[in-house]
Amino acid sequence: MVHLTTLLCKAYRGGHLTIRLALGGCTNRPFYRIVAAHNKCPRDGRFVEQLGSYDPLPNSHGEKLVALNLDRIRHWIGCGAHLSKPMEKLLGLAGFFPLHPMMITNAERLRRKLAREVLLASQKTDAEATDAEATET
């Protein structure tokens, strides 16, 4: 268990610690720091510790980069820190937690939508092929 120092307790004044994303970067180029911060502090304000980073824009290889200090995340969760919803989803994708239920639901919806589009495209090409054969004869 972590003991909060008196200096930290004075600035704390109730609430709880939250592991969340702090926005950085510039216009049209977001970059997030994964931080442990008090829930009363502003989103981009003071934080207790930086636990990683997240770059949501794909790089030249189509990858979204995430750096996590899983030992420190495990430590803060053990100390009673709460997770924000985006962090729950991100840690689920990283394999640290089970996948968030909405991630599974959205993946199923997307899979069904893509299957429907492929089926419609194949039916359209079959119809065009039969029309082309009918006009040739």
Curated annotation (Swiss-Prot):
InterPro entries: Ribosomal_bS16 (IPR000307), Ribosomal_bS16_dom_sf (IPR023803). SUPFAM superfamilies: Ribosomal protein S16. It comes from the Eukaryota. It holds the Pfam family Ribosomal_S16. GO terms for cellular component: mitochondrial small ribosomal subunit. Component of the mitochondrial ribosome small subunit (28S) which comprises a 12S rRNA and about 30 distinct proteins. One of its GO terms (molecular function) is structural constituent of ribosome. The keyword Ribosomal protein applies. The keyword Plastid does not apply. Belongs to the bacterial ribosomal protein bS16 family. Disulfide bonds: none annotated. The modification Phosphothreonine is found at residue 130. It is found in: Mitochondrion. Its main location: mitochondrion. Keywords: Mitochondrion, Phosphoprotein, Ribonucleoprotein, Ribosomal protein, Transit peptide. Residues 1-34 form a transit peptide. One of its GO terms (biological process) is mitochondrial translation. This is Small ribosomal subunit protein bS16m.
